[in-house]
Amino acid sequence: MRICRNSAAWLLLQVSVVCGQLPYHALKLLGSNYARTQDAFQKLCRAGYLEVVKAPGHKSYFVTDAGFEAYCWVLQKARRKSNAFIWGKPTGTHNIEKAVRLSRINEAWLFFVLLCRRKYQTSLQIKREQERKAVRSTDSLKYSRFVGCIYNEERFIHPVYHFGNGNQRLNPNGEKNAAVRLAGAMMSFEKVILIETPEAIVDILDYLLWALKKDSHALRHMRLNFHITWEDNAILLPLDGSAQAFVQHFDRKDWRAGIAQMEEQEKGKAGITLSLLRGQWMELLEYLAREPDPEAPVRIIAWNFQQSVLRVLRERGMLPTKARIGMCLLQAE
């Protein structure tokens, strides 16, 4: 198979070498032309450059020896006499449990580091640090949905979780071991949860809304299930590239002050105003849990990447009939 530089196949091959095993869903993060990326993926598979791992509810891929040789050949041909840096061949696995875990860790790294250019450390790197420091029970990290940490400019931390299609449970032991790493940080902020589709985000919000209307036992169950409470106030991000600008900007210098100013301006207007500008949904859920008058006017201010989630909420009848949505834009760098 002939691979041309600047083609979708070359981009896909490079990402497969740099990131390692990835879920099929990660193709949506590689450029705006998804159909072209899918076509390139099929060609690379037919050429034997990528190998697919399948199981019910899971599909991932990794670069083969032939694919890695093709990558090296294209890179050396393009740079000829220069001393080109060539990545080592990443490992892939056919073990389904390991494939699910590894591909999600790698997809989160792809999203935060390559796409959003944030300071980020994977859970595997954190696990190795814990082992060097003789922290006990690090093996249970592999059973959790914890995939890494984001650092901001002052090295504050956001723990990151990957919920896949939304139907996930977090392992309490894995959660505790993740907390060991956070204990040495200056401050820990909200959890960031990656979810593949807007529909899956709405599934989680629907469950949380149900739990908020129940008693304390249901709330305890909610914490064990999704680990999203008012105290956590987790940031939910769709893994489709639309949240790239938000991830690049949030928690930078003056971010919180700027958001507070925008919210104050909007909430000064008549009627009820709910804000999603911090990436969190608990303010809206708390309002909906009170079962307000569906005809009452309410204004929801949100970023452009949250519009698809709000659309699904409206389609499912979870938003008040007269709810108006104000959209704010962020430009990716």
For every predicted segment, state its role.
Residues 1-84:
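Basic, Lys/Arg-rich alpha-helical nucleic-acid-recognition elements, primarily the DNA-binding modules
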Residues 13, 38, 42, 109, ...:
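Generic detector of well-ordered alpha-helical segments enriched in charged/polar residues
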Residues 14, 42, 46, 110, ...:
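Surface-exposed alpha-helical segments enriched in charged/polar residues
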Residues 46, 72, 76, 80, ...:
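Generic surface-pattern signal
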Residues 55, 161-165, 196-198:
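Short loop/turn segments at strand-loop or loop-helix junctions that form parts
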Residues 75-79, 85-89, 218-220, 324-327:
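Glycine-rich loops and low-complexity Gly/Arg-rich segments
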Residues 88-173:
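Exposed, interaction-prone assembly regions rather than primary DNA-binding/catalytic cores
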Residues 175, 179-333:
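C-terminal regulatory/effector modules of DNA-binding transcriptional regulators
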